Design a protein with these regions (language model features):
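Core alpha/beta nucleotide-donor-binding catalytic domains of modification enzymes
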Residues: 2-68
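A structural signal for isolated positions on well-ordered beta-strands in alpha/beta enzyme cores
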Residues: 3-5, 43, 74, 104-106, ...
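Classical nucleotidyltransferase
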Residues: 55-163
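Phosphate/ribose-recognition catalytic cores of enzymes acting on nucleotide-derived substrates
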Residues: 151-226
Length: 226
């Protein structure tokens, strides 16, 4: 029986080459893995994308990884897929080597919703404009992020309104504002309801965007928790 697998690069090549690119990821590696598992993918390979791997020639990627290591028979890629050192490989190059390495390239047709192609760039645009209902529709799920609770100034706690400060790292973010949220803790399937503020703290001269979440009817210490 053939198995379906997905290759994921971490960090994303685009972020690796452009260090100034922040708030770009739609999902973490862990989220991608969980989403793919729900789609009955048999195996997921998360390949570390570093300086050495970035210099891999496109033909060597086909030969050593797609052919020898994975024994690929069908390779699914989008029309704009590029790979290999300096993005030298493309879909045409993959097709050119089909016979030699005994695989078949398949280009899935674009998915349309209301005459718009579903794409990560469009979803990012919806989020940045605060159009969450459309972002969720194109994601086919509710937009979510995950992170570690960090210790903040504890100002909220002192005034009876404690908040969890979430490390948002490189996620693409929704438009700054106040949102109703549902929270899941790692290894705990009970959903907690709360309210979140995504934005800056001008009164504290805070220039970095923050995600602060206040949980309803909850007491406990969540510092350093996921």
């Amino acid at each position: 029986k053939s198995k379906i697998g997905v290759i994921n690069f971490d960090p994303m090549p685009k972020m690796f080459f452009n260090k100034s690119l922040k708030n770009f990821k739609l999902s973490s590696t862990n989220q991608k893995i969980n989403l793919l598992k729900n789609l009955s993918v048999d195996f997921i390979i998360t390949k570390k994308f570093d300086k050495i791997f970035s210099k891999t020639k496109s033909i060597n990627f086909i030969k050593n990884i797609l052919s020898q290591k994975l024994d690929s028979r069908f390779i699914f890629v989008s029309n704009n897929f590029r790979f290999g050192n300096k993005r030298e490989g493309d879909v045409k190059f993959l097709i050119k080597n089909e016979v030699k390495y005994n695989y078949k390239v398949i280009k899935p047709k674009p998915l349309f919703i209301k005459k718009k192609i579903v794409s990560s760039s469009l979803i990012r645009s919806f989020l940045e404009k605060g159009i969450l209902n459309k972002a969720n529709k194109f994601l086919n799920r509710n937009w979510s992020i995950e992170g570690i609770v960090q210790k903040g100034r504890q100002v909220g706690k002192k005034i009876g309104f404690p908040t969890c400060n979430i490390d948002i790292k490189d996620y693409v973010l929704a438009k700054p504002g106040v949102y109703a949220v549902r929270v899941l803790r790692k290894n705990n399937f009970k959903t907690l309801k709360g309210i979140a503020n995504l934005g800056y703290r001008p009164t504290f001269n805070q220039r970095k965007i923050l995600l602060e979440v206040h949980l309803f009817n909850f007491t406990g210490n969540l510092y350093n928790k996921h």
